Structures are given as C-alpha cells and as structure tokens.
Amino acid sequence: ALHVRVVTSVSITALHRENDGWTALSADGQRFRANRVIISGGGCAQPKLGSDGSALRLLTNLGCPATTFAPALTQIITDSTSIKGLSGIRVKAQVAVIDRKSVLNEEDGELLFADYGVSGVCVMQCARYAKDGRMLRVSLVKGMGFADAGEFRRELHQRRKNWAQRPMAEMLTGLCVPRLSAALMRQADWRVTESSLCGQMTADMAERLTKTADAWLLPIRGVKGFESAQVASGGASVADFDPATLQNRRLPGLYA
C-alpha cells in the first residue's frame, strides 16, 4: 500500500518551495508538506464542476509563464438580424472565421441556428478564433448536395425555366426548409411578394442568392462564456515543462 492520504473539500490558496520540498497552504489555514506537487486543476470551463482557474494562479505566483484562459469549444454569438426566426434549424455547412480577408479557421459539419447566433460541433471548433469584429462565413451549397457554387447557380436557372409559373418563394423547395429559404432570399435582397414567380428571377438575383448560399457572412459579436464552454484555451506555457516528465524545468518537484 502507498499509504496516500486523501483530503477533499479543501481550497489550496498558496504553494511555496521550502528546502527540498513543497508546502501548500489552504484557505482554512491547513499546511500540507510534500516532496512533489502535481497541479491538475483544469481551466475555467464549466465552473459549476469546480474548474475556476485558481490552479493557474498557483503557477503564476511561482513565476510560471501562462496565457489567460478563454472559452473554447463553445457557441458563437453573431449579429441576429439576418438569422432572425431560424432558431432550432439544423443544416450541414462549412463555416470559417474571417479576419478582414484572412481565413483563420475552417470546419465542416452540422450547424444549429439559435437566437443568439450559431452552435454545432463545427462552430464550436471555430470558437477560439471568434472575436468581436470578425466574420463567420457560412457556406450551405455542399450541404444542399451541390459540388460548388456554380452547380447551385445552374440549378437556380434550371428552376427558373422549369418552374416559371411557381411562386418565387418556392425556388429553394427541396434544398432547405422554408424558414431558411426565406432568410436566404432576404439576405440576397430578393423582393419576393405573393405574386412573384420563379420565372421572374433575373441573372443578377441568381448571382446574389448564390453568393449568399455559398458565403453568408455573419458579424461575430463574441462567444458564449465559460459556463457553456466544453474546454478553455490558454493556461500554463508548455515550454516551461519537460514534455517527457511534465516536471517544471526551473522548479524541481513541480508537475502540471
């Protein structure tokens, strides 16, 4: 037996190196002596589970370099103007975070529209790059079954011919649900009325709708907080620890 003593419900507030060992101090005044210390306190994600970032402060107080925690693998908050009324709709999509003209990250998968913005695995994997002022580009054409934007455009023109007398609001029937179809048309500045027919679609209208379906730009306002995040980015610098042993390079007996 290793004769390890397990102590629970104790908050460690300070860690000091003394002689050849370590002393940990708790909030209620207890002192714990050890030859080695392993810090595995997690980040700030899901604080209701006890992950509040306090373990990182123990390291930074010892001079260990670190990066501030930030929510990662979480939902992205966007401007809600163009996605109003789409909450609950799931689609296959390609999403990318754009900073000016640079693509910072791109993912494929299922996207879920929400009142605050968008969610889904592909969105959450982009969250660490999402910042206020950047854009989230959403492409739906491949999820609709098309190889590229050109094939989508050709389908629109084919429907204009074959469905000339059908209501224009039905132009995307079979490709997406009516609520999403209406939102795409609004974003593409289609002025659809009850009397509008598919045969009245112009080449310019087809081009605008194609651009919207292939590169719908949603202004990013931020991300959901640590309460919603599955993980947090940031933390102690990995360069400060030996990758083979996880021991601190400067402080013997300290592991993280």
Give, region by region, the residue ranges found by the protein language model:
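Short hydrophobic core segments
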Residues: 12, 31-51, 59-60, 110-116, ...
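A conserved short coil-to-beta-strand element within the FAD-binding core of flavoproteins
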Residues: 8-21
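An anion/pyrophosphate-binding glycine-rich loop and adjacent beta-alpha core
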Residues: 64-68, 75-201
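Glycine-centered tight beta-turn/hairpin loop motif at sheet-sheet or coil-to-beta transitions
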Residues: 27-29
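Short loop/edge segments at beta-strand edges and connector loops
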Residues: 6-10, 68-70, 224
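Central helical "cap/lid" subdomain
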Residues: 48-73, 104
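A glycine-rich dinucleotide-binding beta-alpha-beta segment and adjacent secondary-structure elements
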Residues: 8, 183-256
